[in-house]
Every structure is written in C-alpha cells, then in structure tokens.
C-alpha cells in the first residue's frame, strides 16, 4: 500500500495520468505571432473546434481550414488525448501553432485510367503543363511526345534529338517546352503544333537539368538555364536561341539547376557543392559547402508557384500579360509566406541540407537518417514539408522550415526514384524500381494507396497542377495516367 493512502499503488498511478478537465491554450501563427488572449478550453476539444475558435479570433470573412501543432506534432485527435500520447506538460499556457491549409482538397488517385504506348524505349521524364491540359514525355527513343489529358490520347511526336531525351520542362506560361538530351543539345518546341522552335547548341556533354525564369519576373517567358555533364551552366534566350551567359565554377558534372524567385540561379554538382548565381549578371554570389559526396538533387520552397506561374489550382490564368504577371507575383509572394526562399539539397553522402541561400552560406539544418544515397528532394506546394526519396527504399518527411524529422514512409521493396506532391500538400506519390507507385498521406503518415500496373521500374512521376491526374513512366516504355 502507498503510505498515507487507502488506494493500492496501481490505482495511484492511474490518478497521476488523469487528464485535466480544462487546458489553457495560446494560439500562435507559424511565424511566431500571438493571436488573441489565452483561452480556457475543455481537454476533449477537437481540431475542428479549435478551427472554429481560431476563425472567430481572426475575424476573417472567409472561414479557412487550419492544421494545429503542439511542439511540432500535429493534433489529429482530441487535445487531451494528444497531450497524453506525446507526454506534454500543461503546467503553463499551451502554445498551439496553427497553419492554414489549402482551401481546396485533392482526392487521391486510385486507378489507372489510361496506358499509353508509343515510346519505343524507356520513358525518362514526364511533366504536366502549368494549365494541366497536356502532358509531355521524354524518352530513350530520342523523342518528346505530347499527350492530350482530356482524351488521354497522343497529340504529337517531336523529333530532333539524336540521343536520349533526359529532361523536359514547360515554360510557366505554357507557351514553350525545352528538352535536354544525351546529345548535349537543347530543343525548344511549340506545344500547340509540336513543331520545333529551334535548337540551342553550346554544351559539349549531355544535359542534366533545365529550368525556366519564373513568370513573375518576366512574361512572356524567354530565358531558361541548363546544366550539363561538361561542368557549365548556361542561360539562353528562347526566342533568339542564343547563349546569354555561361557560368563555370563547378569542377565536375552539374546535376541539378533551379531558377529561384528572388533573382538567383542555383546549381548542384558532383564536386559536392551548391552554387548561388546572380541571374542577371551570371556572377557567383556564394558557394554552399558541407556535403561529403556528389549532390544529386535540389528543391526550392516555392517551386510549385514558380512552375505554375499565373495558373492556379483551377488551371485558369488571366489572358492579359500584365494581369498574368501580377497574379504570378501574388502567387509567389503567398508561397514565400514572408520568409526568404529556402533550398534543399540531397546527396550521395546519405544526407540533406536545408539552406536560406539568399542570406547565408551556413545551412539551417543538416538532415540525416537515410541509409543510402538520396535521389530526390521535393517541397510541398505550401512549402511546409519536404520529402526525400532514397535508394534505401524509404521516403522521409521533414519540416520544410526548420528541417526537423517528421516521419519515415516504408512500403517500397526497391529504391525510390521520384516523388510528386498533390496541389493541396496533403499527399504525395512515389515511383520505384519495384515497378509500383504509392500514394502517401501526410496527416496520418501512412500509405494511402498502392498502385501496381507497370511491368518494370518506374523512373519518373508527376502530379498535375490541378490535382486531378498522376502520370508515370519507366522501363516498360508505357506512359500511364492515374485518376480518382
């Protein structure tokens, strides 16, 4: 018996973990601003009830959906249950951090609605147009193919490359496509006709990456950047097909390029570095060092907004160029969320770094946990999450602002090659060497759907900007479209 008590010890232990009837909470935004007074709420308050309380405090005309976090753990059940599970002390006012969610909801893709043969070698790259109406695919058969998403049928076969088409990128205004090949050439295409606009030559080895200047900086889109095995980065004018600048401070192959929204170009290389360039002058601003092996992949926190320009999740954009540019500016600023642009890098050294490259050459965080090389990193469209795909067959989820670890997703039985997010940031899809696609849910940290169907390795995946379709391609030469 416990001293001074008529209760046996096991009953005392139960009393110690009893939930308080009420909890004092303080709402705080994800940038640290306190909202409203401290509130006395019942311990069984739900996330939906917290949402109603917060909308009342914010006095907004439109009631918005929110996610709530305590100590960076999302509340997905009654508050008291969440606090007990996570051993959170409530001796002082509890800081409840809120984040707005997308006002629209993407439904998970669940079935293959089209298997589109046509390529005669492996499909190496797929990308949806910013307006979500077309899909472009690049293949080892040297062609770019365009597909109509309304009818799920082939539109055009674009010929020009003399070797594998390694990368495909739509301009953010949906008016052009650039492809980079194993032959070292860059081809520009008119997606309306499938005709070549012209060829850009200058690289001496194969093209590893291409990226367009964002629409909020220039419309119509004219400039794009390419990276190559020849160690250089080149900026091109799409209308004249001339090389405007050639930047060469990397000592080994360039593996990835990104054109940021604040006037910088980012490049990663097998020389273990990430370089930050001034996009107007081609001057090296700073070099980000820390990786111990090849840097394979880069991702930008505002990438979804940069890729889609003036096109929102309904696939609509103003027809007037000035209005379109203004909308692209608004979408980029909203994606930034009042913070500097963040960059993530993933490497053969099994680690990732999170950077604020416009302000510092020191990383915000070093992210460890993968047991093999990292193939790809990708920010969610709202910039709050970061996922990494690895040869260790796992996917890891990280906080996109702080770089802290959130979850590991296991289910693939082969290396994970690529990942793509749904437009509402609630799900992502992965493609693997094991021939499957898998849809994962962020809130539950679990597998949502398994999508078998490919006969061999899945090299490339993309989720349409409107959220309605997923495209995948790989070694079996067949392009597949997946829908709800």
Which residues does each predicted region cover?
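Short, contiguous acidic and Ser/Thr-rich linear segments
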Residues: 33-48
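WD40/WD-repeat beta-propeller blade N-cap
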Residues: 116-123, 159-165, 200-207, 248-254, ...
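Loop/turn segments within WD40 beta-propeller blades
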Residues: 127-132, 169-174, 211-221, 257-263, ...
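WD40-repeat beta-propellers
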Residues: 126, 138, 144-147, 168, ...
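Short acidic beta-strand-loop surface patches of small beta-rich interaction domains
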Residues: 34, 65-86
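A conserved positional marker within WD40/Gbeta-like beta-propeller blades
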Residues: 143, 185, 204, 232, ...
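A structural motif specific to WD40 beta-propellers
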Residues: 111-114, 153-156, 195-198, 242-245, ...
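Conserved strand-to-loop turn within each blade of WD40 beta-propeller repeats
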Residues: 137-141, 179-183, 226-230, 267-271, ...
């Amino acid at each position: 018996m416990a001293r001074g008590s008529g209760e046996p010890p096991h009953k005392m232990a139960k009393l110690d973990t009893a939930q308080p009837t009420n909890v004092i909470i303080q709402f705080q935004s994800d940038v640290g601003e306190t909202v409203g007074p401290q509130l006395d709420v019942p311990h069984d308050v739900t996330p939906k009830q917290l949402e109603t309380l917060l909308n009342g405090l914010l006095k907004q005309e439109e009631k918005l959906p929110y996610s709530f976090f305590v100590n960076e753990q999302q509340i997905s059940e009654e508050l008291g249950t969440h606090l007990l599970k996570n051993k959170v002390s409530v001796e002082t006012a509890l800081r409840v951090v809120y984040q707005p969610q997308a006002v629209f909801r993407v439904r998970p893709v669940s079935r293959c609605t089209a298997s589109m043969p046509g390529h005669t070698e492996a499909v190496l790259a797929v990308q949806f147009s910013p307006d979500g109406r077309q899909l472009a695919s690049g293949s080892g058969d040297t062609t770019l193919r365009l597909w109509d998403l309304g009818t799920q049928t082939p539109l055009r076969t674009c010929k020009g490359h003399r070797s594998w088409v390694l990368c495909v990128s739509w301009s953010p205004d949906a008016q052009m496509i650039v492809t980079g090949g194993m032959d070292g050439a860059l081809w520009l295409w008119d997606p309306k006709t499938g005709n070549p606009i012209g060829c850009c030559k200058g690289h001496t080895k194969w093209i590893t990456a291409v990226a367009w200047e964002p629409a909020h900086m220039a419309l119509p889109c004219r400039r794009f950047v390419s990276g190559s095995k020849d160690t250089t980065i080149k900026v091109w004018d799409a209308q004249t097909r001339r090389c405007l600048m050639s930047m060469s401070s990397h000592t080994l192959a360039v593996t990835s390029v990104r054109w940021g929204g604040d006037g910088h170009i980012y490049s990663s290389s097998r020389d273990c570095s990430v370089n930050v360039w001034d996009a107007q002058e081609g001057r090296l601003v700073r070099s980000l060092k820390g990786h111990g092996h090849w840097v394979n992949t880069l991702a930008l926190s505002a990438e979804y907004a940069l890729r889609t320009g003036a096109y929102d999740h309904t696939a609509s954009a103003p027809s007037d160029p000035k209005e379109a540019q203004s909308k692209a500016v608004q979408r980029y600023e909203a994606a930034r969320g009042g913070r500097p642009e963040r960059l993530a890098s993933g490497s053969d050294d099994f680690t990732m770094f999170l950077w604020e490259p416009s302000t510092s050459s020191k990383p915000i965080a070093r992210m460890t946990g993968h047991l093999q090389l990292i193939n790809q990193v990708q920010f969610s469209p709202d910039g709050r999450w970061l996922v990494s795909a690895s040869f260790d067959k796992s996917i890891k989820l990280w906080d996109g602002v702080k770089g802290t670890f959130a979850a590991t997703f296991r289910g693939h039985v082969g290396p994970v090659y690529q990942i793509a997010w749904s437009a509402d940031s609630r799900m992502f899809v992965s493609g693997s060497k094991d021939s499957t696609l898998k849809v994962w849910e962020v809130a539950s940290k679990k597998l949502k759907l398994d999508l078998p169907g490919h006969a061999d390795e899945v090299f490339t995946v993309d989720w349409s900007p409107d959220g309605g379709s997923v495209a995948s391609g790989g070694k079996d030469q067949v392009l597949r479209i997946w829908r709800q």
